[in-house]
Amino acid sequence: DYEELSQSRPATTTSGLLQGVSAGLYVSQTSGKPGSEGVSMRIRGVGTLNDAAPLVIVDGFEGTINNVNPQDIASISVLKDAASCAIYGNRGANGVILITTKTAKEGRFNIEYTGMVAYQEPEHYFDVISNYADYMEIMNESAWNVGKANVFSQTMIDLWREKEKTPNGIADSGYPNYVAYPNVDWMEAIFTPSVYQKHSISASGSTERIKYLMSVSYMDNPGVIDNSTVTRTSYRFNLSSDVTEWLEVGARIYGYRSDTELADISGSMTLLSRGVPCIYPYYDGKYGWMENPEQSSESRNNLYFFNRYKGSNITHYNNTTAFVNVKLPWNIRYHASFNYSWRDALQKQHPTLGDAYSFSRDEVAYSYNDLSKLYLTYTQTHTGRWEFQTTLDWAGTYGKHDISAMAGFEAYYLNDQSFASTKTGFENNVLEEMDNVLEATSISGSQTDYAAASVFGRVTYSYADKYLAEVNLRYDGSSRFARQSRWGLFPSFSAGWRISQEDFLKGTWVDNLKLRLSWGKLGNNSIGNYDYLSTYASGYSYPF
């Protein structure tokens, strides 16, 4: 029951809701950065050396699981075996996740609000040495254990021992002792608890012929590291109308706008493990530097590293579907739908300015203020995709025999475009735009596309709701493969026996017992758009 699941788990993403709730479905977060789509999903293990992620279908069309607001979902199904996935042909090798979004409830106008406010901080802080005198003594002991000379002099150890007695005293440089002779816990210096919030409101209703649902949500996640905030506004509009008794038309529109700060927090745990206590993170508008000249020159200010780039990534996404359902004679139903989605992203990034300062010596140790070396990069990407589906369905009942059949056609096209430019040499540090940068140093762009077409069909049979059979067949073509290997046939068969429906089990403690046998053939098109056109390149060795 998805509604019960979503209310019982305070997950912020749809993928997070699925963690640990379906046998054989493995969900893990590969990045802790706010706004990151870093999620790994595997159904029954890794199925390929290429992309092993399952296919996600949202209201009948391929989508991205975390593009859907969890509050807009009505149900989620996970298809795992080959017989169930074969109807998706060369996209179903790694399993399929089916998502159906909410529609209006009949008979009344309804407004629903869902909100969440959460306090967030790292679940666990690593124990680090924050007392610098202790750090120096341990480093000396480590060197002695391998027969090497001391790393730090006793004079420096004694100096830090003396200054830590009066942390609020003033050093000769004029700065407080706790700044000039610091003892920094880098876990506490980097991570800052914050408040996460998400609010969703929806309105739905219906008349005799029209059903509608509208929703909007807002999410603000400041993260636990500075300069990593992400905000996101999502929207959805579902509409259907029974024009006549035999004709239904409708549309589904959803999308979002997100704004993500670009903190460089990749490898943050590795950097924190190398942090030394003798660098004060930030004071009086300056980043600290190593206050002990005996300290390794490879030591860095971790706070500056995480803030060394400034910028944002603004993304707009929209997904629109129009559909028509027609009831024809002889229990035949015709369905046609067209889906178009687009995604635009604009990323602007440049290094930050600032001095690395020695507070004990009252001098600039290293300067990051050279405007001539400061660069600005713009990266813009656009993805457009359309998909068309049409099906004919028939179902009939003859005594205890239930038979249904479906045949369909699908066409798909995707186009990716990207453009990037870099200019170097800021005229001033006020305007962070291309007009304020002097020299163009890099311009690049690319465009790729991908097309697919398919015909497919399904026949199901049931006798007395006890003996079941299903046959699927799909014929797929994909531009990602060479011309002679472009098309593939993907059949499947399954048979089932509801043993609990037999007379000899009725009235017993067995409520539901089913035996199922299935076989299927699947394909995988999760490769590059032009991998079959690979060419030779210089600088590589070939075995011929």
PLM feature spans:
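Short, small/polar-rich motifs associated with maturation and membrane association
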Residues: 1-236, 243, 248-250, 256, ...
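Membrane-embedded beta-strands of outer-membrane beta-barrel proteins
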Residues: 41, 97, 201, 237, ...
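Extended, hydrophobic alpha-helical segments in both membrane/secreted and soluble proteins
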Residues: 73, 235-237, 336, 453-459, ...
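Surface-exposed loop/interface segments of Gram-negative outer-membrane beta-barrel transport/assembly proteins
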Residues: 106-182, 193, 223-230, 234-319, ...
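Transmembrane beta-strand segments that form the barrel wall of outer-membrane beta-barrel proteins
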Residues: 216-222, 469-478, 519
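Solvent-exposed loop/turn segments connecting transmembrane beta-strands
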Residues: 224-227, 479-485
